[in-house]
Amino acid sequence: MPKINLTRRQFLKASGASLFLAGLPLPGFTKDEPPGTISVIMLEGGMDGLTAVPPFGDPDLSKMRKNLIPDNYLKLNSFFGLHPSFQYFSGLMAKNNASVIHATNFPYTKRSHFEGQNLMQGGGLSPFSETTGWLGRALDLAKTPGRSMSLDMPLLLRGAHENDNFFPASIRNSGTLKTDLINMISNAHAQESSSIFTKVSKKSTQKESVVPRDPASLAKYAGKAMSIKSGPLSSVIKVDQFDTHSNQGSDEYGRHGERLAIIDDIIAGYKEGLGDAWDRSIILTLTEFGRTVKENGTWGTDHGWGSAGLLAGGAINKSRVISNWPGLAERDLFEKRDLISTIDYRSVCAACIEHALGLDHDLIVDKVFFTPSLPRIYDYIFS
């Protein structure tokens, strides 16, 4: 039989999933057990921070956006509001269990989905410079053996250590085709990967209906898994379709508003699933870039830079809107079109890692983000 030129990574990409769990505490891990869990909601396409958290106190907002400002926004303070899709998140803000970071993002300004998504997961200094992800590297430093919910391991969770499946993964074909595929690939890679495909073959015979598919149920499922003492320490849920170049809408029934409602449902699902473990949890959103400040000619927005980040969890004990607001006047925008990112979102991620995994800030910024000068903003979020 001829050898098939199929790498393990290519095989792993053959199975799609929306939820990933990783980072299992070491057996007998007690005194030095990491104090919390960290969950990431990846928002692919570029979430519009000005729609999600409208700065209604900025006089230039209404000049730039005549059709995209939600009328019934939820007031946070004298300057910022929340999109009406965030009913649950708003309640967490009122209970001091959620915060917003605004005018923030990763230091990437080229507006490419592929490059931006790679950087938000890899956390490298340039696109495609890393084969591991920032959360995976953090789990490595915390010495937690990773386990993944799916064969399709996202870059964000990849570390130097091997990741095994925590739950059965599904290859979306018939059982016969699935078995034939595994046997074919296993034979082609008999020397270098027999143990890998033995694991895959065993898991392929398990029931595939265990894991729910809707985002809220996935979050609840992940929360329950992380609430167990021997369960995973981290999870990732992906939500796409934020690339609203046309007919974006302004209220909860618009295209962007419907995606924001999914975020709200995911956070609610996490809280329900985590139960008492909510008190040691932190949830954060990631997006590759924001949207243009000025709406375009098709009632939408184009690729931008700065956006907003949402944080939730019992680890937060005081709700805040954390922002060094740059302004929306054209002279204040990046290249006269984008909200400037004044807070490096890697600092936000570093603070969440520090809290959840108990790692030192200097170690995180050096070994996870390769930027020793990255500011520490832990106290702004968690004190």
Q: What is each PLM-predicted segment?
A:
Residues 1-19:
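N-terminal secretory signal peptides and thylakoid transit peptides that target proteins
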Residues 16-84, 88, 93-95:
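Intrinsic-disorder/low-complexity recognition with aromatic hotspots
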Residues 32, 81-179:
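Extracytoplasmic mature domains of secreted/periplasmic and thylakoid-lumen proteins
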Residues 34-38, 95-99, 144-146, 230-234, ...:
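Loop/turn elements at helix/coil->beta-strand transitions in domains of secreted/extracellular proteins
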Residues 36-47, 89, 233-239, 267, ...:
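Beta-strand elements within well-structured catalytic alpha/beta cores of enzymes
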Residues 44-48, 105-109, 154-157, 241-244, ...:
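Solvent-exposed loop/turn segments at secondary-structure junctions
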Residues 54-55, 66-87, 244-257, 261-383:
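Feature marks hydrolase-like catalytic cores characterized by long aromatic- and Gly/Pro-rich stretches
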Residues 178-273:
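Anion-binding catalytic surfaces of enzymes that hydrolyze or transfer phosphate/sulfate esters
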